[in-house]
């Protein structure tokens, strides 16, 4: 454990991703760190379960100097994208970056921290508009699910929440996250479809009998 536990500011979408948030809070608490959750409203909602939660901090009222690190949690796309351009949030990211404090973002929240990603590798949810924003900021998008580059920790999607949160705790504690991921080279695009014998037989039967269901 670090000699001094970190106090982490967690910015969440108003309609937040519950898997990302609760997994992150569990990791921070288990490692002895404290946190403050901030959002654009004091009532936030799990976008999947509809569970409402009351918090005490509006994101507009937060200051970098009061925290040791910053994390950004995604959720509803409209709410998540709002932080990409919200002046106070972008100013916060810049302040944390200038102060050399650890920063983490996951899924569609990664473009929110692009000001801290110049010259750094990042994982991100593969939307073209996300990639364009990141590249314009000088970030280096990666085709792997989780990336740690210095004190910046990013993840592609919620499936990596636990590893992402634990890796960030390692960074907070001055430890090597020890994440080794491999790019298998897959890229979405057009490719020749190979015929499937079973499907071709089914199509032939359907065409011959005029039936759409085969027993």
Predicted regions and their residues:
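Extended, subdomain-level signal for the structured scaffold at the beginning of enzyme domains
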Residues: 1-103, 111-123, 128-215
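Catalytic nucleophile serine of serine hydrolases
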Residues: 107
